[in-house]
A protein has these predicted regions:
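Membrane-embedded transport module
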Residues: 2-53, 67, 72-215
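Conserved Rossmann-like nucleotide-cofactor binding loop
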Residues: 59
């Protein structure tokens, strides 16, 4: 892969099907027009890839708009390219893109973990109330208890989870499918498992408390 070079004129002579077959082998493009750049972006997208396009000129704007992630130069880039892009490199340093990807992945992971923590705790509360209702026992939580749990014992740890720094292996992970939401099958299974375990621990303490007070 990456052993071919193509000029704009040669690209014009290719059909979309021919370009799709060759695009993964082309590493250098020369004298390409804005239309050529759009075709290159579309060819990679048809292969199921998430495409990022960098540019700084007016002629780059259409492809920047077409790409999944258009990246414009903040210092040397034109206003047209900046308006078309979804991300602007304020220092014109391509290494910053890698840092941005790492930060984005870390933010997404932290949000997901914080949501998982909150939903697991709420699941445990629901299961505990359901258990005591079915068993004919006194409700384990008063409204003020639930308010305290949601405002303090859940919110503060969730904020801490949301501020976790990125680890060194974050960029080694495979990119996630952009069509996949947060509530995946694994997420739901983990949420229910943790919620059940917390509910069991809470109800065990509840029964111990009842037995102790009755003794």
């Amino acid at each position: 892969e990456g052993d071919l070079a193509l000029t704009g004129a040669e690209l014009d002579a290719l059909t979309d099907k021919e370009l799709d077959d060759k695009v993964s082998r082309i590493s250098v493009y020369a004298r390409v027009s804005p239309e050529n750049k759009i075709r290159i972006v579309e060819a990679w997208q048809r292969k199921g890839n998430i495409v990022s396009m960098t540019g700084d000129g007016v002629n780059d704007a259409p492809a920047l708009k077409k790409a999944d992630i258009g990246v414009a130069m903040g210092i040397t880039g034109t206003e047209v390219s900046k308006d078309a892009a979804s991300m602007i490199l304020s220092d014109d340093n391509f290494a910053t893109i890698i840092k941005a990807v790492a930060n984005g992945r870390n933010v997404y992971r932290n949000i997901k973990n914080a949501i998982l923590f909150l939903l697991s705790g709420n699941t445990a509360g629901i299961l505990s109330v359901l258990y005591t209702s079915i068993m004919g026992l006194a409700v384990p939580f008063a409204p003020v208890h639930l308010l305290f749990i949601n405002l303090l014992t859940d919110s503060l740890p969730a904020l801490a989870i949301g501020m976790e720094p990125a680890d060194a292996e974050l960029l080694n992970e495979k990119p996630r499918d952009p069509k996949t939401g947060i509530m995946t099958k694994d997420f739901v299974v983990t949420m229910l498992s943790e919620g059940i375990l917390i509910a069991i621990a809470a109800m065990s303490a509840y029964h111990i408390g009842i037995a102790t007070s009755a003794a």
